[in-house]
A protein has these predicted regions:
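A general structural motif
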Residues: 1, 28-30, 185-188, 213-215
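Helicase P-loop NTPase motor core
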Residues: 1-4, 10-29, 37, 179-180, ...
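Accessory N-terminal region flanking or inserted into the helicase ATPase core
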Residues: 2-6, 17, 96-194, 201, ...
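Structural motif
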Residues: 7-10, 35-39, 192-197, 221-222, ...
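Structural preference for long, well-ordered alpha-helical segments in enzyme cores
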Residues: 18-22, 47, 95-96, 156, ...
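Conserved P-loop NTPase-based nucleic-acid remodeling module centered on helicase motor cores
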Residues: 28-132, 140
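Structural recognition of the conserved hydrophobic beta-strand(s) that form the central parallel beta-sheet
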Residues: 33-35, 61, 191, 215-220
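Extended, H/D-rich, highly charged conserved domains that either
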Residues: 197-265
Length: 322
């Protein structure tokens, strides 16, 4: 049982490093690569390419949600149906319609369903329950905040009472309670890649994976793993905290911490302007670019829609003309 951090700036080849290591051991040992949901298909494709399209019998790209589904089927507890995002929105809309006369702010607009849904998602991700909200509502002296919190408490309570399903965050809670009983991840090698950070739920799951797996490897986008006190002076502030928190988790559970892998050679930024920007953005002291920039442009948009339209038109122009 060990933890190894693989780190380097953006474009240093952290994912490539993982794919190459996996390809060397493909079908020799059980390997899992955990990625965010939106990266799963791309990761599978890249892994197949690195493995020369060999059958990946003992190697698998997986997400936390897919992992939860797998463990639930193995251990049990799959009686409740998963609640989709649209199903969650419909349920919240129904609750909002019934509770609108008791709410101070949230009942005035049906569009607040999105705000309520996103808030409940964040609460569950970071282990904030109804009692935590009540405690905050009782202690705050800001009446505006108190009223908004009371609205959210009402919606959260009704949501928990009404729900006969499992939403995406409940699934991870169940995974967290069941994963140590699972045999699927024992003595395996795990790579965790492409995450910009982890929620409280995910940290807890990773801590348990450290106790099960032979080795857990995590990629982190940062220039070093030294703690930085001033977030305004370090673009990698949050990422460094992620690395430090993982190290502390490993120490807490008596997990061996292997030597870090630091990658320094930039592969992605062949353009000198972008390379200079990446190296000096937030750097103290910074270096001034001596040449006139030709590949970096600034555009002040009125809103996100005009920003997207401008970017799309620029892409079309570059593809057609350059």
């Amino acid at each position: 049982m060990s933890l190894r951090l693989i780190y380097g700036k953006s474009g240093c080849g952290k994912s490539e490093y993982c794919f190459k290591e996996i390809a060397k051991n493909v079908n020799k040992e059980k390997i899992y690569m955990i990625v965010p949901n939106q990266m799963a298909l791309m990761a599978e494709k890249r892994l197949m390419e690195k493995a020369d399209n060999l059958g990946l019998v003992n190697t698998e790209v997986i997400t936390f949600s897919r992992m939860a589904f797998r463990v639930r089927n193995e251990i049990g507890g799959a009686k409740k149906t998963n609640l989709s995002k649209s199903g969650k929105a419909m349920l919240l809309y129904d609750i909002l319609s019934k509770q609108k006369d008791t709410l101070n702010f949230l009942g005035k607009n049906a569009e607040n369903v999105d705000i309520i849904g996103n808030s409940i998602t964040e609460f569950k991700k970071h282990r904030i329950d109804i009692e935590n909200l009540k405690e905050e509502a009782n202690t705050t002296t800001d009446m505006y905040l108190k009223l908004k919190l009371n609205d959210m408490i009402t919606m959260y309570e009704e949501f928990e009472k009404s729900i006969q399903f499992l939403d995406e965050n409940d699934v991870l809670d169940i995974l967290n309670t069941q994963i140590l009983e699972s045999n699927q991840f024992k003595n395996t090698t795990i790579y965790i890649d492409e995450f910009v950070g982890f929620t409280t739920q995910e940290y807890e799951i990773i801590a348990k994976l450290m106790q099960l797996a032979k080795e857990v490897n995590v990629t982190i986008c940062t220039d070093n793993l030294l703690q930085q006190e001033d977030a305004d002076k370090d673009i990698f502030y949050a990422n460094k905290n992620t690395g430090i928190k993982l190290i502390n988790l490993a120490k807490e559970y008596g997990i061996e911490i292997e030597d870090d892998v630091k990658l320094t050679e930039l592969h992605r930024f062949k353009n000198e302007e972008l390379k200079h920007l990446e190296e000096n953005f937030y750097a103290v002291p910074y270096k001034t670019y001596k040449e006139e920039p030709k590949n970096i442009k600034m555009f002040l948009a009125n809103n996100q829609y005009t920003e997207i339209e401008h970017i799309a038109s620029e892409i079309v122009k570059l593809v057609r003309n350059e």
